Amino acid sequence: MPSLEAPSTRSRLQRMVGSVLLTCSVLLSLSACAAGKASAPQEEEFSYAWLKGYAHTLATESYVSHKGELPKSLQGMSWDDYQQFHFKKKAALWREDDSEFRAELFHLGLYFDTPVHIYQLENGKAKRIEYSPSMFDYGKSKVKGSQLPKDLGFAGFRMQFNTDWQRDVVAFLGASYFRAVGQEMQYGLSARGLAVDTALPKPEEFPMFTRFWLEKPQPGSNIATVYALLDSPSVTGAYRFDIEPGERLKMKVDAAIYPRKAIERLGVAPLTSMFMVGENDRRTGYDWRQEIHDSDGLAMHTGNGEWIWRPLGNPSNLRFNAYSDENPKGFGLLQRDRNFDHYQDDGVFYEKRPSLWIEPTGNWGKGSVQLVEIPTLDETFDNIVAFWNPAEPIQPGQELLYSYNMYWGGIPPEQSPRARVVDTFTGIGGVVGQKRKYYSKRFVIDFAGGSLPMLGKDAQVKAVISTSQGRVEIESARPQHAINGYRAMFDIVPPEDSVEPINLRVYLEVDGQPLTETWMYQWTPPPMNERELHNAGHLQ
């Protein structure tokens, strides 16, 4: 994966210049106005209410492309060259103040080629931070700061907390991407401000944070506040992030979204991760490591109270699923497997990757949690996307308000009180020692926690299995003492004439009462000519 010093983005970023078309009447404190174009002054009044008004009016104007040209010395850089750029510690924001936070800025270059405007905010006054090459150390790169334009701008920013001034707790860099860490201080999956038209038969649109306002934290406060303006051909937005580091870093997010035009698929609170190889999916299992992933499952807490665990996969073709819900209580991409032995990677430490849990504030109405799984042969490619998609059509002129909490870290703040899935294994079906006469797929799901450790030896635990097609056989549910839980096991015999995906649901019950969260899975049977029976020689 890319260095922890900067979050990765998987889009071709648009370039940004510093003006937008707005009418003079809505600029309020942004008083500089000429021919309908607004440029940010050096110091002006600022509030979140103003930012929402600014974004709302911007959405009524035609989108102005932000494309520009970087200096040649910053074009075509390698990742190693870009990593030579370091913001000087002595230039960090709030370094000389009694603050629990410091902020450093990212230099433009590589594929971070779109300047953003960054402002310091204190006591309701915003002042733009002017670029200066003296802020940066260019290391062994061939770039000479003295030859760069004085109005170059920045690519993004990152923050550190008083527990460790050398390591980031959050970073915003590229389009509307950002990342954060929990107590493990380990970057992993990313989030975005908004997703537009993901996994449709047309190019995805990547809205961009074009301006940031970094509010100076109060002395002794462990919360840092950031405001952001989002812009794209289809939508604008105003965002507020209250960032609180801890065992789980918490972000309180308020978003006001203003569509410029109808949007076919809007993604609210989008998450981006990577899954290449896991215990349940070894399609690309040629690597010496047994597991390679930033996240291993999508967790959902539905509006009706059901807890669902959906293991991720690396399909051979793009896979899209929508899980309908109303007023969801939470969803997220989690890294449940925390065992180093399962990864054996002492370079990137996948077992330390943070989970990210989204907790909606208020009612989000009807919609669906949507999951996109993209084939990948490369662990540096983020191939997993999840977000909330509202059911109501998105039309221009609307104001869409969303508030939610984001929790970054090892364990989400809220989990199912029932037993949870800890492992999912798959393989060839059938009975050991007996000749296989037809193809089947074996599924093994381990559950632990909840009330399982308290069950008596005579408890009649049953696996409740449902499938959209195919036949279930050789099913069982039995104690698994190694995890102080239970193991559900069954085979699926797919239809002979179909390679359509099969949707599976499993949970454990006793006396008709659920004991576990719901395990949900989608499996695509192979074509008939690839359904090998793998019978041993003496069983041929």
From Swiss-Prot:
Coiled-coil annotated spans: none
Organism: Shewanella oneidensis (strain ATCC 700550 / JCM 31522 / CIP 106686 / LMG 19005 / NCIMB 14063 / MR-1)
InterPro entries per record: Gal_mutarotase_sf_dom, GH-type_carb-bd, Glucan_biosyn_MdoD, Glucan_biosyn_MdoG/MdoD, Glucan_biosyn_MdoG_C, Ig-like_fold, Ig_E-set
Encoding gene (name): opgD
Cellular component GO terms held in the UniProt record: outer membrane-bounded periplasmic space
Primary location class: periplasm
Signal peptide boundaries: 1-34
This protein's pathway: Glycan metabolism; osmoregulated periplasmic glucan (OPG) biosynthesis
Subcellular location field: Periplasm
Gene Ontology molecular function: carbohydrate binding; catalytic activity
Protein's recorded name: Probable glucans biosynthesis protein D
A Pfam family that the UniProt record links to this protein: MdoG
